[in-house]
Amino acid sequence: MNVKMDDCFQFGLGAFETISVADGRPIFLDRHLRRLEDAARFLDLGMLAERGIDRITVLEYLRKWMSEHDYRDRSGHMRRCAVKIMLTQKNVDFSMRDNPYTPD
């Protein structure tokens, strides 16, 4: 990722959503995108559609990432993970990480 310096780095002005992924599917994706849209509007970061963030983009990112990484446990099941979408005035970033939280 080529990071552009903006107010996020100087003042923490940005928004993010971390979305649980189970069996390769993002949980409550539409709700997360609505919440990110609300935050972007409030912080004047631009509309998600204008920034290239929508349901299809997230699903394509997940599909591509999972095809490039072996994210299965020893028994062959998909490990729990999370996709994080970060949005600042000049940057959009998608990243993946383990999800240590259990349904319990």
Model-derived regions, located:
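Conserved alpha/beta cores of soluble small-molecule-handling proteins
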Residues: 1-104
